[in-house]
């Protein structure tokens, strides 16, 4: 059975676990006398073999407040690990990433609260998530979560960060707890039609998102609030087709040969000079993508597709147009002959005539008809960056080929 084969690949061995435990021993020594716990998928037993990142939470009394975490707590942690290979990262508040033997350990300051619904910062709920999941999943259930995670990674819908807008690890765990197994999650998802409500607990307020899973440890929160409709739909379609014809392609998609370029494709390569948090950068990239698309359409271009990918240093925006060539002039459609606005139309336009349909028309010159210039002008990054832009002629870049192909390898 395919799922058993996948598990052999993704389930960590005892050696894998020992390797991470050795790294954690180093961290434990550095955090001695602090109130800390290992959290996340490693602690819950739902981690994948290829994932070598571990979460360690350092807890402080809730009375010290959020500002204390951002300054005092962070400095305390840095002083304890400053001789190790570490970098600062940013979410709701800063945290530290330590790299030891190719294992990434996220050391996150948090506040110790009585229950998940009393969380002051988002990370304060984490230990309650851990307790909930470990009390509701047996060993087989953990393997079912692993299968679901790998499936979602394979089809590109895993990861709650803004860049992806997909399913979090916690969401996959709750789905398996609710439905009972990987296959049962897929059977349900294949029939989804939004809005979808999955209630392990009764919500404490109304939610408007397309997929609603109230957090069992804090029912005021929707666990899947960040999941985009596109990713919900992709997961549903993939579930349907996997159940029809199970394949390793869903878990480990293959690379395809070069695709034919249809239309004109503009590639914008951005190299960022400054570091910032991933969510901040990708919030600006998504706004840029929307602004570019809107500006191109307003200028008369027919946009087939526009996508962005990359990390926090190097980003690619690909714009696919029916054609990069549009006329310098265009037909401007005016009001009907009996409209009170015809005087205004006549004053503002030249080359005016009355059409066979009784409507006034004119010829107008486009303000902008260079698609490349329009796209570059509508990038709204707030950090310094260099940009290289070109019209695609050919490529061996796998991500660009994926953009050209459109159809996921698991679908066809």
Swiss-Prot record:
Presence of the UniProt keyword Thylakoid in the record: no
Binding-site positions, ATP: 41, 44, 129, 149, 158
Catalytic activity of the protein: a tRNA precursor + 2 CTP + ATP = a tRNA with a 3' CCA end + 3 diphosphate; a tRNA with a 3' CCA end + 2 CTP + ATP = a tRNA with a 3' CCACCA end + 3 diphosphate
Outcome of mutating residue 55 to A/E: Loss of both AMP and CMP incorporation
Cofactor(s) of this protein: Mg(2+)
Gene3D superfamilies in UniProt: Beta Polymerase, domain 2, CCA tRNA nucleotidyltransferase, domain 2, Poly(A) polymerase predicted RNA binding domain
Outcome following mutation: residue 93 to V: Loss of AMP incorporation but no loss of CMP incorporation
Keywords: ATP-binding, Magnesium, Metal-binding, Nucleotide-binding, Nucleotidyltransferase, RNA repair, RNA-binding, Transferase, tRNA processing
Ligand binding (Mg(2+)): 53, 55, 106
Any Gene Ontology biological process: RNA repair
Binding site for CTP: 41, 44, 129, 149, 158
S-S pairs: none
Molecular function terms, GO-annotated: ATP binding; CCA tRNA nucleotidyltransferase activity; CCACCA tRNA nucleotidyltransferase activity; magnesium ion binding; tRNA binding
Function summary: Catalyzes the addition and repair of the essential 3'-terminal CCA sequence in tRNAs without using a nucleic acid template. Adds these three nucleotides in the order of C, C, and A to the tRNA nucleotide-73, using CTP and ATP as substrates and producing inorganic pyrophosphate. tRNA 3'-terminal CCA addition is required both for tRNA processing and repair. Also involved in tRNA surveillance by mediating tandem CCA addition to generate a CCACCA at the 3' terminus of unstable tRNAs. While stable tRNAs receive only 3'-terminal CCA, unstable tRNAs are marked with CCACCA and rapidly degraded.
Further remarks about this protein from its record: A single active site specifically recognizes both ATP and CTP and is responsible for their addition.
Quaternary state and interactors: Homodimer. Forms a tetramer upon binding two tRNAs. However, tRNA-induced tetramer formation is not required for CCA addition.
Full protein name: CCA-adding enzyme
Organism: Saccharolobus shibatae (strain ATCC 51178 / DSM 5389 / JCM 8931 / NBRC 15437 / B12)
Gene: cca
